[in-house]
């Protein structure tokens, strides 16, 4: 050793599987919730959650369009966050997660062809109680 100290933040981390990305997003969400707690707007949590994964080299995109066409009429959905083009993240700040919101994430997975989705509700005392993970099939794309 030459006496230099390295923190985890200075060591490049390869994050390239849906499982690794999912773990990185959950870790980032925990950081955001620890700092800000419950009660903010979804848009604030989305901005914070987009920032954190970028710090470890992950690409993230907000408001990703999922077009659906029915009889010539374009309908569409928007994914809150898509991390590394692998993991769909739907962010909420509500009193409770209804089955409709869970079905929403499953629909996003089906329409996007992605294998892992996270539904994260920041309006809870302990964030572990606000995270639901969804898997679309068994193919880890």
Predicted feature residues:
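A short acidic/basic microdomain associated with nuclease active sites
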Residues: 54-69
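Structural motif corresponding to alpha-helix initiation and N-cap regions
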Residues: 75-76, 102
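Solvent-exposed, charged helical/coil patches
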Residues: 1-57, 128-129, 133-141
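Nucleic-acid nuclease catalytic cores
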Residues: 92-139
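Conserved catalytic cores of phosphodiester-cleaving nucleases, focusing on short active-site segments
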Residues: 37, 79-97, 108
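Acidic pyrophosphate-coordinating catalytic loop
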Residues: 70-74, 127-128
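Short beta-strand or tight-loop elements
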Residues: 64-66, 77-79, 115
């Amino acid at each position: 050793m030459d006496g230099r100290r390295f923190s985890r933040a200075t060591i490049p981390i390869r994050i390239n599987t849906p499982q690794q990305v999912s773990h990185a997003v959950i870790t980032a969400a925990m950081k955001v919730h620890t700092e800000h707690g419950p009660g903010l707007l979804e848009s604030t949590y989305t901005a914070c959650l987009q920032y954190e994964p970028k710090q470890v080299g992950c690409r993230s995109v907000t408001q990703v369009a999922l077009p659906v066409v029915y009889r010539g009429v374009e309908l569409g959905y928007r994914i809150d966050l898509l991390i590394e083009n692998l993991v769909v993240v739907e962010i909420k700040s509500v009193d409770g997660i209804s089955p409709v919101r869970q079905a929403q994430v499953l629909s996003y997975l089906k329409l996007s062809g992605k294998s892992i989705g996270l539904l994260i509700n920041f309006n809870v005392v302990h964030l572990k109680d606000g995270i639901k993970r969804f898997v679309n099939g068994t193919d880890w794309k």
